Amino acid sequence: MPGTNDFRSYVFDPARVDAAGKNVGQRVYWKLYAIENLVRVMAHSILTAQVGANWWAVAVDPGIQASVQRRRADYTNRPWHGTPGKHDIYYAFLSDLSKIIIANSHLFRPVIPDIDQWIARLEQVRLPRNIVGHMNWPHKTDRQRIDVVHADLQQLVQQLAASGTGLSIP
């Protein structure tokens, strides 16, 4: 729907709300989904290789661990809902993932030499991700930023795989 715009710019029409939602889902949301989950896979894989299978307990800040445990408890207390995943990393927000990478950048640097640039790029999509995640309309510049980070992250994953870095799903 190339002509779809933010429904809030028009007189209320439920069809415009649906069209805007479909547009965001088809053009933006799936890329954010991929970005966040590719970061999870890379972080898990690299930290498992560098620290070991118990990397979460060793390499993650206790404050992040506590936040994740609260989020996990929310799902445990409502078993009629699905859960984000088995590993704690699936309960971590994008901002948490960035903090984990920052705190362990020395472990990422041998595999991803420009890790500091990647941390900055993740920060560039954090707020646009929240806009989309909270069901709002992203600005054109934010959509373009998401497009570029998604494409570049796909390339990084391919480079890691080609270099022999084992990538595994947490």
Residue ranges and their predicted role:
Residues 1-170:
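Amphipathic alpha-helical interface elements
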